[in-house]
Amino acid sequence: MKTYCKLLYAFPLLAALFAHSACQANNHLKVNTTTITQLDINRYMGKWYEIARYNHFFEKGMTHVYTEYSLQPNGKIKVINRGIKDGKPKEIIGKGKQPSPKEHPGQLKVSFFLWFYSDYYILELDKDYQYALVGS
């Protein structure tokens, strides 16, 4: 009888914790991904240093990370990520594109492996192109 009562009291507590966790998970998914509405792609090209990030597989454990963007003659963007890992320089070369420059100038796509592209959203950009907030 005592075990049954303990389980009976524990069930509402577990249900409440589960509901709270589900709400927190939902809050995590509701990130504002509104991108900038104007972008001069030529001004965006160049070297950008990372101040903070969520690690991607190719940046895990890296420090002094920066990315260089260069516009290619075919309109694609060359992307080179560089950094230091275990005291040694590392780099990965990828490609980027701007699928809808007129409708969604701040929504780009970046690929570091074959034809698999990830979202690259410019969420904020300084008017002088001195800093940017990027998400996916």
Task: Give residue spans per PLM region.
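A beta-rich soluble binding module of mature secreted/lumenal proteins
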Residues: K2-Y9, L14-S136
